[in-house]
Amino acid sequence: MSLFDTINSGGTQLLGVAWPTVWALVRILVVAVVILLCVAYLILWERKLIGWMHVRLGPNRVGPAGLLQPIADVLKLLLKEVIQPAQASRWIYLIAPIMVVVPAFAVWAVIPFQAGAVLGDINAGLLYAMAISSIGVYGVILAGWASNSKYAFLGAMRAAAQMVSYEISMGFALVVVLMTAGTLNLSGIVASQEHGIFASYGLNFLSWNWLPLLPMFVVYFISGIAETNRHPFDVVEGESEIVAGHMIDYSGMAFALFFLAEYINMIVISALAATLFLGGWSAPFGFLSFVPGIVWLVAKVFLLLSVFIWARATFPRYRYDQIMRLGWKIFIPVCVVWLVVVGFWIMSPLNIWK
């Protein structure tokens, strides 16, 4: 009997019919707290890694080796006043940050941490993740519009165009994964990557989707960077052009919610990429299968997040027209071509996903 089965049986005996509701709330709370801690220390890791790339130390004053720096940053933002511009639309101005951060949390309902460990193991998990993650753009648009500032509105318009453009290529990448796995269930997609010619020899990592679907993996990950408005696609909040984009008139915790959503979305994109293309909780080699699946998922997500940060420290910011051209004239045609190629591949005698 697994740990979850033991907890379920004990809780049912203790609380009866109320236990499923209590257990669901406990799991949601645990996942939310862990995500918040991950965001706090992802920001510290970003500052440290970029510091090392710049040949400097990074934050090292608050706590041992700077480990308490995220807590100091949170306290600073909590103590700052939320100053609302006189010309802003009050309620829309206050609702916008919530509309950005809630979808970022909601996506975690369907992401499997290991076999059987998922908040909601629904059959349409992939569709749910794509739909929910698309809602955040409305909060960005409302933030730019409610501030009644030309800089904020320009940033919001850029965000809307950029997110819609790259959602198309991300959607094509997810369709290709759906074609190969034959299911929208994220746990089922991970399970479909655990068998194959290479997996039978213990080389599990060669059976994952990243190898046969490499162009889709690259397109999905780069589109994910653009979706989260991260460097080098951060023209939405381009400091040298429009100050801070849609967040220019926000302060205190309202401002912090936008940053919280950005970093949660980074983790979401990395977790989905690991699940869809890198085998999720699967071990890279058969002899390492004794290691808990969540350890492998965390390791893969950490690696992909480090690539996010490396891109920020390495590449210059694209011009807005270059970003649009990349999405519409390069990524979408590549996705359509590879979609057709994979379709013929699946129908041919050389199908490796049987």
From Swiss-Prot:
InterPro entries: NADH_UbQ_OxRdtase_su1/FPO (IPR001694), NADH_UbQ_OxRdtase_su1_CS (IPR018086). Its EC number is 7.1.1.-. GO terms for cellular component: plasma membrane. One of its GO terms (biological process) is aerobic respiration. The chain crosses the membrane at residues 25-45, 91-111, 126-146, 170-190, 205-225, 267-287, 290-310, 330-350. GO terms for molecular function: NADH dehydrogenase activity; oxidoreductase activity, acting on NAD(P)H, quinone or similar compound as acceptor; quinone binding. NDH-1 shuttles electrons from NADH, via FMN and iron-sulfur (Fe-S) centers, to quinones in the respiratory chain. The immediate electron acceptor for the enzyme in this species is believed to be ubiquinone. Couples the redox reaction to proton translocation (for every two electrons transferred, four hydrogen ions are translocated across the cytoplasmic membrane), and thus conserves the redox energy in a proton gradient. This subunit may bind ubiquinone. This is NADH-quinone oxidoreductase subunit H.
